Curated annotation (Swiss-Prot):
Glycans are attached at residue 308. Signal peptide: none annotated. Vacuolar effluxer which mediate the efflux of amino acids resulting from autophagic degradation. The release of autophagic amino acids allows the maintenance of protein synthesis and viability during nitrogen starvation. This is Autophagy-related protein 22. It comes from Candida glabrata (strain ATCC 2001 / BCRC 20586 / JCM 3761 / NBRC 0622 / NRRL Y-65 / CBS 138). Pfam families: ATG22. CDD domains: MFS_Atg22_like.
Length: 541
C-alpha cells in the first residue's frame, strides 16, 4: 500500500501544466466534472432519508409500535387499544420501566442523535487523515449501503419488534450522519480540482452565473446550492411516491411501504455515484513532487485499511483543537451557545409536532405525509425569500434577521399553548396544523440560510473547516437534549401539549444570547486569530 501526497495546495486555482507527474494517463478534466455530478448524486440519494424517514416516518412507526405493544396507563394488565385517544405506556427492560408511547419516540430520537454524534466525530478524523477521493467515496458508499439496508430492514419488521426498530433506526441515522459530513468535506476538493484542471478558467457552472473560477467561494456556493436543490427535489419525489404507496397498502395507512421505498432509493443511487467519483489528480509514485501537504493518497482506497484506534482518536483531537480556537473568540462562543438552543428548539418542534398531530389531532398517515411535503416546500421558499427580502431588499443585518426569525418561530409553541385556554383554536383542528406547517417551514429554511452566513462573518479566514465542524456538531448534537426533555415532560403529564411550554421557553431564552452578539467585534477578533499559525500535524498520533 503506497501513500503519496500533492506538493502543495492549489495556488489561486492556477494549474502548473509543467508538473506532468500529477497526471497518470486519465482524462483528469472529465474526472473532475464527473466528481461534481457524483456529488450531486450524494445529495440526491441521501436527502430523502432525513426529510422523509427521520422527520416523519420513523417517529410515527415508533409511536405506533409502542402503542401496539403497550398497556393502558391506568391498568397495566390491560393491553393498549389501537385507538389514539387512549393513554398508553410501554414496558421496557422486562417491564422495569414504563414510558409514554409518545415519549418512546422522543427518547429514541435523542439516543440516535447521541450515537450519531459519537460515530461522526470518530469517523471524520479517519477521513481527515486520508483525503483521497477514492477513500472518501468508499466511506460514502459503505455507510450509504449500510444505512439503506438498515432502513429496508425497518420496513420488514413486524409490530412486536420494537427493540429491533430502535437498533435499525440508530444504525441508519448514524450512517446518514457520517455520509453527510464526508459528502460536505468532498465539495472543496472537487472545486479545487475543477478549477486547477480547467486551463482556460471556463468552468461551466461559473460561466452560467458570470463567476470567475478564481472566485472559489462563489463557485462553491453555486455548486452547493444546486446540490441542496437536487436533494430537496429528490425528497419531494420520494414523498409523493410515498403517498401513492401508502394508499396502495392493504390498510391504506401502512407507512412501512414508504420506509421501504426510502431505503431502496438510498441504495440504488449509490451505484452511479460510485462509478462517477474518482481521484482526478493522482501523483506518480516515483515523482519528486510527492511531498506531504495533507492530501494522502491510497490507490486502493479501502475503508477497512484505516479503521484503527489512532484514526478514530484523531477526530476527537480535531474537536479539541476546534474548541481551543473557539474559546479565543468571544462572539463565536456566544453564537454557538445561542445556536445550540435555537437549533435544538426548532428540531424538537418537528419531532414533537408530528407525534402531536397523530395522537392528539388523529391525523391520517396520508395527511401527515402531505403536511411534511408542505413544510418542506415552505422551507425551500423561506431559505430563498427571507435572505433576499429581509437582508438584501430591507438591508436588515444578519444578527437582527435571526432575532426576527426566532420571534417568528416562537409563535408556533405559543399558539399550541393557547389550546389550554381555548376550546375552538390553539391546535384543536387538523387544518391549523397545515397552517403552522407553512409557518414552521419558513422558519427552518430561513434560519438555515441566515445562521450560516452570520457564522461565516465571525470566524477566521482559512479555518472555516475547523469552525464549521463545531457548527455542525452543535447543530446535530443539540438534538440530544430537547427530545429527551420533552420525553420526560410527556412521561410525567401524559399530555404532549405541555411540551409547547418548554419549546417556547427555549426559543425565548435564545433571544438575549443572540442579542449579546457583536458582529463587528467578532470580525475584528477573527482577523486577529487568522494571523496565528496554529495547526495539527495530520499524521501525528
Amino acid at each position: 500500500m503506497a501513500y503519496e501526497s500533492l506538493a502543495s495546495e492549489p495556488n489561486d486555482g492556477v494549474t502548473d501544466h509543467n508538473d506532468d507527474a500529477l497526471y497518470v494517463g486519465i482524462d483528469t478534466l472529465k474526472a473532475a466534472r464527473d466528481n461534481i455530478k457524483g456529488w450531486y448524486l450524494y445529495s440526491f440519494s441521501s436527502e430523502p432519508f432525513v426529510v422523509s424517514a427521520v422527520a416523519t416516518y420513523v417517529p410515527l412507526l415508533l409511536e405506533q409500535f409502542a402503542r401496539i405493544n403497550g398497556v393502558q396507563l391506568d391498568d397495566h394488565n390491560a393491553p393498549c387499544s389501537t385507538s389514539s385517544s387512549d393513554k398508553c405506556v410501554l414496558g421496557l427492560f422486562n417491564n422495569r420501566v414504563f414510558v409514554d408511547s409518545s415519549s418512546f419516540a422522543l427518547y429514541v430520537f435523542s439516543l440516535s442523535v447521541l450515537f450519531q454524534t459519537v460515530v461522526v466525530i470518530s469517523v471524520s478524523g479517519m477521513v481527515d487523515r486520508w483525503k483521497t477521493i477514492s477513500f472518501r467515496k468508499n466511506v460514502l458508499v459503505t455507510f450509504g449501503m449500510v444505512g439503506a439496508f438498515a432502513t429496508v430492514l425497518i420496513s420488514l419488521l413486524n409490530e412486536t419488534q420494537y427493540y429491533s426498530l430502535v437498533v435499525y433506526y440508530i444504525v441508519a441515522n448514524s450512517c446518514y450522519g457520517v455520509i453527510n459530513v464526508v459528502g460536505n468535506s468532498l465539495l472543496p476538493l472537487f472545486v479545487d480540482d475543477l478549477v486547477r484542471l480547467q486551463p482556460d478558467h471556463t468552468v461551466p457552472a461559473a460561466e452560467e452565473l458570470s463567476l470567475d473560477t478564481d472566485d472559489k467561494d462563489g463557485l462553491t456556493t453555486v455548486i452547493s446550492g444546486r446540490g441542496a436543490s437536487i436533494g430537496y427535489s429528490a425528497a419531494l419525489v420520494v414523498q409523493l411516491m410515498s403517498i401513492l404507496l401508502v394508499r396502495l397498502s392493504p390498510s391504506k395507512q401502512d407507512i412501512q411501504y414508504a420506509v421501504f421505498f426510502v431505503g431502496l432509493w438510498w441504495a440504488v443511487w449509490q451505484f452511479p455515484m460510485y462509478w462517477l467519483l474518482s481521484d482526478s489528480i493522482i501523483p506518480d509514485q516515483q515523482s519528486n513532487q510527492a511531498i506531504a501537504n495533507g492530501r494522502y493518497y491510497d490507490i486502493d482506497g479501502s475503508i477497512f485499511t484505516f479503521v484503527n484506534l489512532s484514526s478514530l482518536k484523531y477526530g476527537w483531537k480535531l474537536l479539541g483543537e476546534a474548541l481551543k480556537h473557539a474559546t479565543l473568540l468571544r462572539d463565536v462562543v456566544i453564537f454557538l451557545i445561542g445556536w445550540f438552543i435555537l437549533s435544538d428548539s426548532l428540531t424538537t418542534i418537528n419531532s414533537t409536532a408530528i407525534i402531536f398531530a397523530k395522537t392528539e389531532l388523529h391525523m391520517s398517515t396520508i395527511n401527515l405525509i402531505s403536511l411534511s411535503i408542505i413544510t418542506m416546500i415552505s422551507a425551500m421558499v423561506g431559505a430563498f425569500a427571507i435572505p433576499q427580502i429581509v437582508s438584501t431588499s430591507l438591508h436588515v443585518p444578519p444578527q437582527r434577521t435571526i432575532l426576527l426569525i426566532i420571534c417568528w418561530a416562537s409563535i408556533i409553541p405559543l399558539y399550541g399553548m393557547l389550546g389550554f385556554i381555548f376550546q375552538s383554536f390553539g391546535l384543536k383542528h387538523q387544518f391549523e396544523m397545515f397552517i403552522l406547517g407553512v409557518w414552521y417551514g419558513i422558519s427552518m429554511g430561513s434560519v438555515a440560510a441566515v445562521s450560516r452566513s452570520l457564522f461565516t462573518i465571525i470566524i477566521p479566514k482559512g479555518r472555516e473547516s475547523t469552525f464549521f465542524s463545531l457548527f455542525s456538531i452543535t447543530d446535530k448534537g443539540s438534538s440530544i437534549v430537547g427530545p429527551f426533555i420533552i420525553g420526560i415532560v410527556t412521561d410525567k403529564t401524559h399530555n404532549i401539549r405541555y411540551s409547547f411550554f418548554i419549546l417556547f421557553i427555549l426559543l425565548v431564552f435564545s433571544l438575549p444570547i443572540f442579542k449579546m452578539l457583536n458582529v463587528e467585534r467578532g470580525k475584528r477578533e477573527a482577523e486577529e486569530i487568522s494571523k496565528l499559525h496554529v495547526n495539527i500535524d495530520p499524521i501525528q498520533d
